[in-house]
Amino acid sequence: MMERVPQPVREMLALLRESGHAPYLVGGCVRDLLRGAEPDDYDMTSDARPEEVMALFGADAHPTGLVHGTVTLVRGGLAVEHTTERCDGAYRDSRHPESVRFTSSIEEDLARRDFTVNAIALSPEGTLVDPFGGREDLSAGVLRCVGDPARRFAEDALRILRLLRFASVLGFSVEENTTRAARERRDGLRAIAHERVYAELNKLLCGENVTAVLLEYPDILGVVLPEILPCVGFDQRNPHHCYDVWEHTARTVGAVPPTRVLRWTMLLHDLGKPKCFTQDANGIGHFYGHTAASAEMAEEIMARLRFEHALAQGVRAQLACFDEMFPPERAAVHRMMARYGRETMWNLLQTKLADNAAKAPDGLEQAQKPWREALLLYDELLAENACCSLAELRIGGG
């Protein structure tokens, strides 16, 4: 397994080993290596104190969290966090321990981690240290807290969102006691900085198992996104919808490609429905004005979570054109591409397909057919490099 670790990381481990320390790779990189996946980044630990790491690696070492024992090592274009093996003191701010005690025990260090699948260490020789059954849970596809789950979530409430994120991205189930503790401790999420919440939601929404997570845990997600709660169980009372507002929403999120613009657009697109609900004389439900109401609520959420400008603009653009209707004809598709641009138009077609896929199964094929045809026409125009806007015309020299 170590042969899959990048050479610069192996060199760092070797230098620590040659200097008399006992280094290990830890956390998500070990989990991903065991899954056969490519790690996004690498973290390591050893008994070396921060000042020893700084001296050993010289210009490659950067003090990014000395109080908690963390030094970032940069070599060969890779940044690796080295955190000295430690035990954590009490948590007062639901994020950082008030004190840490450095140790020379890898088992003690692993005991402070969040989930068993993240509490496995890998030595430079390829030996695994797994005191909490992480490999077994990894094989079974189970997320379980290390030790007492209530304590883990009390230490850092963001771990609750991390739990949901891993369930979404990895497609794992959550062990019963861990689920119960996450629900009992969910109010702790109110104290978490919006930036940290936003970072976790971005990853959660782009997971392959996102629909199941949204349907299973709206009570937890509703702490950080209270706007979703009125949608849960809201009967649309409309023959075109067999799902309540929240289930429809959750299904649309999972039905679009996993880009942040599309996933956020679908999460937000129907938030205004409950406040716009009316029934006609036949008892049929209608939601007049819900698109504008949803867009307004989306603006509040994006401001609160401090979306970066480009993502906010992208979501805003998709919500603005969400209700566009046009026939699956070449001229109409070309006209829409000219109006919105290629990217927004492609996204619009994806939202149309997802929105219809999450309505009544009866007539689904009929509802999808024109949008599939429009997407084929879009692809044809794109392949022909058809001019779609005046700006493109000027660039092309026409």
Name the predicted role of every residue range.
Residues 1-398:
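Catalytic cores of the polymerase beta-like nucleotidyltransferase superfamily
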